[in-house]
């Protein structure tokens, strides 16, 4: 038997079937570094329009987790796709370096008795070490960026830039000093930003407390009575017994109805709507003897339960009837609403009672409870209320309560002297910050769109921003306050610039070691140099100002405003939020044009990642087991607008999808063996009809993918590329062309037409997958035929694809109809193979019984119809001639019948043909193969 293998154009490529990503990817990273890929991208981008994505800085502490990986991969996919779209899209990674978590780590390692200077020194060293670790982990993900020159909030230039930004805000009239209740953590010993607060369930003691009337006549008059006749008390309900020692007022809603209830030996004032539930709680029976509005109770005085002072009634719209008594006790030092209402009624800062120290312990001078930790004092306060006869009821409830995000310990509101940015404070010029921010939100694009309403509601309802902290490791607030008046030095803005210049050279240490006389001279004795530091959200929130236009200038045609900020959904209350406020103060607009938000990563059951649940997916382990490209493919395939589910099983599905894409690429490369685009490529008009369709289909898909990339809809990109590889290529085109590719003469028009199409498809595909499968695309690029530059990233979307003419006879709709016919034929052949009626498709002879219009379509392919259907013979007949046993298909007007061929099998092309052995020199092969080996070769026109 003759071996005809040498006469076939069998596929051949060195592109490996096995990806070996965990081993190969680090080699690719080394290659990118050795060729200076990022620097080359900046060179070729000099004359391109710029696209700026400003990196939200991760905190320089610990290893990266799966959420970090998602964030960085999304950013990289966007910037790679923008580069391919013809933009200069730099990426400068950043790190958030100051703040309590790092200070806490240093204290744990080195103890709490460090000097402030030593603490800062160790914090800077620790942050630097953490950054190097995270940097290598981000690079391993395939993220292209200026990794040798990142921005760090602890860089001297950025610390100085932050001080200059603060100076601009002071100059603009946005900053003020105030006594206000702020989120306070005893473990931190500092105020916390809203973004540093999380909510957890907490068990608390609730108490109903009676405050005895002091103005009996006024209370009687308010209820329309000549006299009370019995002792009367107003009853409050609270979940914070520890605030009772600081009580200074009682709040009622002006429009609610309040009842005077006779319970036998005394009278109680309660919200009328809650009388029944309150009496049941107190195990009392009573009768309502009069009602009035909250408005009528205003300024009536009651007595504090155990201190010799009065508590007046103030009106407050925030009072609710959902629980309690309808009366709220007010401790202005420990509640934002309490504070605001008391200030409205003229309470001065000096009048506010604030007995809780920064560590959560009452001052020693507090009668009954001095020196006690507030949460431990709760029971002692309850006991005292019992002793004085004021406790009506106590219960234990579980409720959502604010906790420190770092220590997981309960927080309180605590009035302290802090520096604030005023949301509604009238600046030197223009609108208030709140109005500016609301307008800026309206001018910003949001992906997903619901982010706009979320950020709007946060801005509309947020309090003033407390920007000061009482920590060592932070950018200083370089203010000098007059010792007598407490006012800022009149040259504050000028002095801040002098400090900034020093910080630029020496870092924040320059302020802390500064002697006031160095700047103030003889005035120094009159001023205090404050030691407060800035909220870390101010650090990251001002990076747009001192990084984009300072340490990493990235201004483009519309200034140093970023085109895009991209972070997790928690950043509506974090970086998006603080950046918006600083941008509106400094530039009167948001520092971004568009905000993209991604969801949190959860497991396949929707649960958060947790070591206790053993469901943590570590990106480092994924890199080592599957490869970063698999993780990148998972990110691209997942709709990031909601929660993003991941597990080992989900990643394995991504690995399976990856193999299908890789195998398609390998098939393309293997069939480009011996193809030189410089000499072998055919013009479109010389290509076969099916090949022209394949290139046209690739062009249409490329347009769709460009649109999806532009809209950041990566899951659409993934699904369309995957479907193209599996269905339109693998399930149709590539299947059909195998016969032509393998059996026709190597340099025939039929084969070169096919290779031309494969080359164009490969050039397009390698670019399509580059933003997602960064490593694999780079590998594929090295194996493509023809001269090319060092990296696919140094190119733009492929421009060699051609569109079918509008009048092309075998147009797109035509091939859609042919695909439908082929699908029906395949379905029947699968049934026959399953029934063992035929061994393979080429054993089949198919007859298609069709309506006239479909006959016309099928007849256009002439004798090449069999190559499209991948059968040994294919014939067409009128539908009316279909035998009774013809199979009805899903295609309208089509029936078919498949028979097993009785002809011999060609040893070369495997078709069963009647002319096998007709040529005595080649008794084992068909006439077509004889012609392809030793004759002029077969001629194809369509497929």
From Swiss-Prot:
UniProt motif 'HIGH' region: location: 58-68
Keyword Metal-binding: yes
Ligand binding (ATP): 611
Motif 'KMSKS' region boundaries: 608-612
Binding site for Zn(2+): 906, 909, 926, 929
KW Nucleotide-binding (keyword) present: yes
One GO cellular component, as annotated: cytosol
Subcellular location: Cytoplasm
Chief subcellular location: cytoplasm
Pfam families: Anticodon_1 (PF08264), tRNA-synt_1 (PF00133), zf-FPG_IleRS (PF06827)
Function: Catalyzes the attachment of isoleucine to tRNA(Ile). As IleRS can inadvertently accommodate and process structurally similar amino acids such as valine, to avoid such errors it has two additional distinct tRNA(Ile)-dependent editing activities. One activity is designated as 'pretransfer' editing and involves the hydrolysis of activated Val-AMP. The other activity is designated 'posttransfer' editing and involves deacylation of mischarged Val-tRNA(Ile).
Subunit comment: Monomer.
Family designation: Belongs to the class-I aminoacyl-tRNA synthetase family. IleS type 1 subfamily.
Name of the protein described by the UniProt record: Isoleucine--tRNA ligase
